[in-house]
């Protein structure tokens, strides 16, 4: 939860830096972070970020590449998965009605909607074998390409 700065070494991705599943990395602010904490919060390709509070609660972002050393802001949740789960398959799930229905059920209703890692870990996720996940992703990608 470090404050954003204009210059520095480590960038800090906020939910407001993500637009249409893209990050404009050159405008992501910097932050101060203890050197010992960097590896704990450092973003890697295939990480998925979730907004855990506010009007964008549940919004997710699949990190495809990380051209700069960057961490994620404190009001985001980061997940990493094993080789058993295709990151893009999970991202598509997080855009589905099943995901949003489960999120709504598990979201705390306060002045600012709120969810946490426990809410996400309790969700039911249809999980076919990895090979089938990649086939599903490819099929969805082809369908989206036709629409564009």
Please give the residue ranges for each predicted region.
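Short amphipathic alpha-helical coupling segments at ligand-binding clamshell hinges
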Residues: 86-93, 132, 139
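Short Ser/Thr-interspersed hydrophobic loop/turn segments at strand-loop and sheet-helix junctions
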Residues: 11-21, 42-59, 72, 76, ...
């Amino acid at each position: 939860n470090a404050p954003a700065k204009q210059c520095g070494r480590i960038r800090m991705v906020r939910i407001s830096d993500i637009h249409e599943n893209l990050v404009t990395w050159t405008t992501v602010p910097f932050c101060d972070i203890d050197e010992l904490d960097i590896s704990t919060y450092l973003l890697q390709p295939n990480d998925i970020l979730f907004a855990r509070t506010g009007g964008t609660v549940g919004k997710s972002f699949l990190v495809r590449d990380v051209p700069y050393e960057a961490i994620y802001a404190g009001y985001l949740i980061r997940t990493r998965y094993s080789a058993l789960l295709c990151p893009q398959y999970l991202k598509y799930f997080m855009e589905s009605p099943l995901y949003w229905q489960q999120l709504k059920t598990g979201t705390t209703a306060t002045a600012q909607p709120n969810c946490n890692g426990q809410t996400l870990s309790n969700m039911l996720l249809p999980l076919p074998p990895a090979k089938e996940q990649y086939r599903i992703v490819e099929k969805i990608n082809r369908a989206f390409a036709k629409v564009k």
